[in-house]
């Protein structure tokens, strides 16, 4: 009801996440098909906005997390295990190609992105089909991590930098 009433309001008071966070922003105002009207924002805690913006619009994946989940799902889903291994191999290749940290071109992670998409689809199917799985929470947590990564990946433009860290 609050969202519907907002269409008739001259002012909306809300947390800044509803304006800036890519997962919870008010899509009816700021998403595709939203109004073209100009907005004025009065932002509380604005001194934290730059750092929070970096957090909201950044995503990272760790190779070790793929391996850890692979061990967890080993007994429960062979297809998911294989997809986790494929992602791990792509990340291992990136890791081996860098000493310390290096900027990565978008094309260099294309194959990884495809496998992440397949993995996310498999996880979604598993989660829908296995409400009572003993590994559900671990899969769900990793699924949200992948989902956030995919959301940020879809927003990539010249303002983003992708980097890989070895070690």
Which residues are covered by each model-predicted region?
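Conserved coupling segment at the C-terminus of the helicase ATP-binding
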Residues: 6-10, 23-41, 45-167
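Conserved P-loop NTPase mechanochemical-coupling segment
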Residues: 1-18
